[in-house]
Structure formats: structure tokens, C-alpha cells
Amino acid sequence: MAAKEIIYNESARSMILAGVNALADAVKVTLGPKGRNVVIEKSFGSPTVTKDGVTVAKEIELENRFENMGAQMVREVASKTSDIAGDGTTTATVLAQAIYREGSKLVAAGHNPMEIKRGIDKAVEAIVEHLRGSAKQTKDAKEIAQVGTISANGDETIGKLLADAMEKVGKEGVITVEEAKSADTTLDVVEGMQFDRGYLSPYFVTDPEAMKANLEDCYILISEKKISNMKDLLPVLEAIAKSQKQLLIIAEDVEGEALATLVVNKLRGTLHCAAVKAPGFGDRRKEMLKDIATLTDGQVIAEELGLKLENVTISDLGRAKTVIIDKDNTTIVGGQGKKDKIKARQQEIRAQIENTTSDYDREKLQERLAKLVGGVAVVKVGAATETEMKEKKARVEDALHATRAAVEEGIVPGGGVALIRAQSSLEKLKVNDEQRFGVNIIRRAIEEPLRQISANAGEEGSIVVQKVRDGKDSYGYNAASGDYGNLLEMGVIDPVKVVRSALQNAASVASLMLTTEALIAERPKEEKPAAGGAHAGHGHDF
């Protein structure tokens, strides 16, 4: 085992502080509407230009291993905040730096770090309570657009696009961000349920120009098994041919004789039909087929339910107003499912989202929920160069998370003002003298985001903080325009979830670092010179 190096007490804390400052000073220049960019070198390709705090934080590795520990702890603050709220990473970093900087002075002066930590925890609890109490629920698309604009660093087009997307697919709908092929940023909305399986044969196409198969007012047969034998399908095909309706078959696969018969009937015009493979794999496929069945008021034909293909009647089939199939996707619009059953299915999926621990499963469940609730919106981000595209895409993703957070827990005045207003909640706290120091650390630290926003805008932080503190409610400083006024009316707003998560994560990690007394790291290995180098080339005979 390699030898370890250990440092204690004051030297440990000063090393942590040096690491915290190195990372936070690089991140905090990006805060606010007048924040600056950071350029990051890449081992290949062009450098990345970013104004996103967590992207900067993730790139920082310090040479000194003890300082690096401090930097990595603060990096954890930024990435945790990004995971929970999707935004507020720079605010969280600024708060963590302020809490640790103030706290380490007190610990050095001989105060009890455990009591300080308790004071910090109580203060954070009081502020979170105050933030939740003063939250205003987002009602209209305009407010959602304002949240998106601020999170996208003042880009109004992004804010408006996201507000449109939310209006079209609902608050639970899935909004995805993709790179566009052109320089324009656009919004595509897919209504109804779409899954990534196309037609099994191009002979099903009804619109040769667009290469799409369109079915109107059709029946939908949903089977879990592979269909290859024509005999099994005959009874249901005859019934549908009599009813003069159209048919979509969704099955594990349709092949051989069964597929050939469907194609021949389609070409002869005796039966207007199409077949696609079922989406997903394994258990997820079963669940997705149940979703389609619920949406269209059909029945999944599965042997475990005692249903066989040859016994299927028209009443077991789903119904939909329109089905559009291209070579890659199938979209079902206007499913005839019963509202109460669809609601029950949505609740079931929501419960699974609450209980799952896997991020991948959660993402897939949210996609399924969105398809049942209303649809999917795709924001296609366009830019003139790839460097700009990457930077813009990161901003759109941030803005998307922020708008979701705003819808979830409501909004408060932005620009660091909500935290200043929450200072009043610290007056009534019952704490002992040592804990009071912890409370005072938080009182001072929560001014830091506003100070930094002002400094980045070229103003003197202390003067701005004093002016804002003298005001009431939503009165604050709009760094984008340089004016003071009602921030809610000006559209300078932050989601409660973002502000809350930033403070909670910053306080959690900073107070842990305050109670640290020793750091242990591996001693660097000394490089030995290569053996035999001195005698090489002297013509020895062996």
C-alpha cells in the first residue's frame, strides 16, 4: 500500500479553502445576466465556450491533492444542484464558498465547529421555510417564458420557445432538446402517442410522396406475440373487412405468410391496413403495449391473460382517429380510451416514478407518462458554428430544467433578492451563543449571490445590497438593465426549487468541510531515473 500524507487542523482547513476559492472564483464570473464566459481547452477539437457554472466546475482538477479535495467538494455542490433543479449551480458554488470562508475564520478563532454546523442547519431550515411561504405559483405562459429567458442567460427566444412547448404538451409532457441541421432554433410538437417503430413493409405506404402510411378511424390489434401464421389472423381480418374500417397491427413481429397476406390485401384494396413492431424490449415492451391499449380502449392479446389470436373479436381491438406511420416512427392521435382508465394508468406510472431509484428508469417512465398525458415537444437548437451550438444547447437544457422547477414549486423575485428578504426569518430563531455564529454565517452568505451579480455588472456589491435591503417585497436590482424596481413585474424571477436546492446543497457540503480536522492523501511517487542510462553506449562486451 502506498504511503499517505496527513495534514491537520489549520493547515488542513487553509488547503481546503484554497481549493474552494480556486474553483469558485472560476465559476462565479459566469453569474447573472452580465456574467462573463469561460473558455475550456479540450484535448481534441475546438475549445468550449461556456457560461454554465456546472460545466466549468466539472473541468477543474488542481495539482495539489489537498487543495483538489476542497475543489471537488464544491464541485459536488454544483453537480448535485444541477441534478435536482437543473440550474442554480453558480449560485450554489458562490454560497458554498461564502459559508466556508466565513466559517473557517470562526473555527480558527477557537469556536466549536459542531455548534456552528447546528446553527447553519437551523438557519437554512428557516430560510427554506420562508422561501416556500413567499412562493408565487406560475400561472401563465408569460411567467414561464421569463423564467426560461433568465436561465438561458437573457435569451428571449429560448424562453418563448419553452413556454410554447409547455403550453402545447402540458406540464407533464416530455420536452427534448436536439441539435438542428440549420442555423434556426425551432419547436416541433408531436401530439398523441409516438413510438420509434416504423412500417414493416413499404407496401403499406398510402402517401408515396412523403413515404407515410396514414390510417383514419382505424382499429388497432395489439399482440404480445410474433404473428406468422395467417390462420390465426383470419377471423379478425374478415370481421374488419366487413366493417369497412382500417386496421393497424402492433405485434412483436409480423412475418412470413401473415405479412404477405396483409400486403396482398392492401394492394388489392380489400383491406386498408398496416403493421408495425411493438416498441421497447422485455418488461418495458409489455408495459408500453398496456399503455397503448389503455389509450385506445383495446386489449393486449397475451396468452398469460388467456387471450389467443384466433379467438379475438372486434371488441378486443383499440380505436384511434388517426395513425401516421413513417419508416421510423408510429404516431397514434385521438385514441378512444376511457378517461378514467387513462387517469388511473397515469397515476400508476406516477407512483413508479416516485419509487424508482434508477435515473434511467425514471426517464423512461416520464416519457411513458408524457405520451399518455399529451405529447412530446422537440426543441431543435440551431447555430452558425458547432461551438456556438454546444453552448446554446447547454443553455436551452438549463432553461428547460428551470421552467420545470418553476411549475413545480412556484417562483420568487430573482437576482438574489429572495434570499435577502429571507434574512428576516433568522431574527426569531432560538439558538445558543455558539449556534448564533452559524446563523450569522448564513445571514452574511446569502447576500453573496447579489454581491456577485452586481460585481459582474460593474456595480459595487455592498451599495446594491444595502439599497435592496432598504426596499420591500419584490423590490430589487435588475442587472440586465441596471435599474431598481419590482423584479416580478420586470420578469426577473427564479424558481423556488432552484434557490432552495442551491442553499441546501451549499450549506450541507460547506458545514461538512468546517467540521473537518484532517486530510489524508497519497504521497506522490518519486520518479527514479531510468537504470543503466549512464553507461549506455560504452561498447561493453558481454
UniProtKB/Swiss-Prot annotation:
Q: Which UniProt keywords apply?
A: ATP-binding, Chaperone, Cytoplasm, Isomerase, Nucleotide-binding
Q: What GO terms are given for molecular function?
A: ATP binding; ATP-dependent protein folding chaperone; isomerase activity; unfolded protein binding
According to its UniProt record, the EC number is 5.6.1.7
Domain of life, per the record? Bacteria
Query: Would you name any one GO CC term?
Result: cytoplasm
Q: Which residues bind ATP?
A: 30-33, 51, 87-91, 415, 478-480, 494
Pfam entry (one): Cpn60_TCP1
What this protein catalyses is: ATP + H2O + a folded polypeptide = ADP + phosphate + an unfolded polypeptide
GO BP term, example: protein refolding
Q: Which family does it belong to?
A: Belongs to the chaperonin (HSP60) family.
Assembly notes: Forms a cylinder of 14 subunits composed of two heptameric rings stacked back-to-back. Interacts with the co-chaperonin GroES.
User: What is the name of the protein in this document?
Assistant: Chaperonin GroEL 2
Gene source species: Sorangium cellulosum (strain So ce56)
User: What is the gene name?
Assistant: groEL2
